[in-house]
Amino acid sequence: NGKNILRIEDTDQTRKVEGAVDNVISNLSLLGIEFDEGPVQGGDSGPYYQSERLDIYKKYCDELIKSGAAYYAFDTPEELDEMRKLQQLEGRQTMYDRRARDLSMNEVSENLKSGKPYVIRLKVPLNEEIRFDDLIKGTIKIDTNNIDDQILLKSDGFPTYHLANVVDDHLMKITHIIRGEEWVTSVPKHILIYRALGWEVPH
C-alpha cells in the first residue's frame, strides 16, 4: 500500500546534464516502472526537483543552527587546502579540523554582515558511538570522532546530498532506504541529522 515517488536529486549543479532527467523518465517508462508522484504526475510531496526545494532545506538548516546541531564555517578554499596538505603530511585522516565550531556569535555576525562566503556544517558530537542495523551487514558501530563535520549547505545555497535526502525522506514519508555500499559510512551523519530535527530514523 506504499507509494512510488520519483525525486530528482539535482543539487550538484556542476554535474547537471541537459536532457538527463527526460531520459531517466523515458527509460523508466519503457521498463514499465510507474510512479504515484513525481515531476510528471505531480502530487502532495512536491516539488520533486531538489533544486526547487532550496527554501525548505534552508528552513531546516536554520533550525539546526538554532539548536546548536550545526554551525557556520567561513574557511576559504585555500585555507581548507592547506589544512588537508598538513594532515596528509602528518599521516592523519583527512577531514575538517572543526576550527569553526566555536566561533562566537559576534564573530559569526560580523562575518555574515561583511558578506563573507560560508557553508553550514553538521556539529558532530564527540566521543560517542553511533549504532545502526543494516539488513545485510547487521549491526554497525561508528565512533563519532571519526565522522567529519559534514557540509550541509554549500556556499551557493544548495544543500549537500546528506541534508537534502534526510529532509526529503522525512517529508515524503520514506520508510525504508536502500543504499549503495559507498553510502553506508554516511548513515551515522544522517542519523545525527534525524535526531537533531527530532525525526524518526527510517529503516
List the model feature ranges, each with a label.
Residues 1-90, 144, 158, 185-203:
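N-terminal Rossmann-like or analogous alpha/beta NTP/dinucleotide-binding catalytic cores
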Residues 66, 71-203:
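Active-site cores that bind ATP or allylic diphosphates and position pyrophosphate for catalysis
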